[in-house]
């Protein structure tokens, strides 16, 4: 079984592979599922706003991704957008 540090590193590596422009990557949440089968890792990163007006007003906005990793092998099973509403 991989440990929490390894799960976090693998999630960060996966994020950077698909979003090389991701800046200021931070760990937000990490959880081992009750059955100990998966690690759920939530990362945030600074993203440039899509609109010029928003960029001028707020600059960078935080984006969130949640990763599901197989706790035994460390394989990334999924990456999803995490919205806070």
Located regions from the model:
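Long, terminal "pre-/pro-" and other extracytoplasmic accessory regions
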Residues: 1-85
């Amino acid at each position: 079984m991989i440990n929490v540090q390894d799960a976090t590193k693998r999630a960060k590596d996966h994020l950077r592979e698909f979003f090389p422009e991701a800046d200021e990557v931070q760990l937000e949440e990490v959880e081992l599922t009750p059955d100990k089968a998966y690690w759920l890792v939530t990362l945030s990163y600074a993203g440039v706003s899509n609109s010029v007006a928003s960029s001028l007003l707020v600059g960078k906005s935080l984006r969130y991704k949640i990763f599901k990793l197989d706790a035994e092998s460390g394989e990334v099973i999924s990456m999803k957008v995490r919205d806070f509403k």
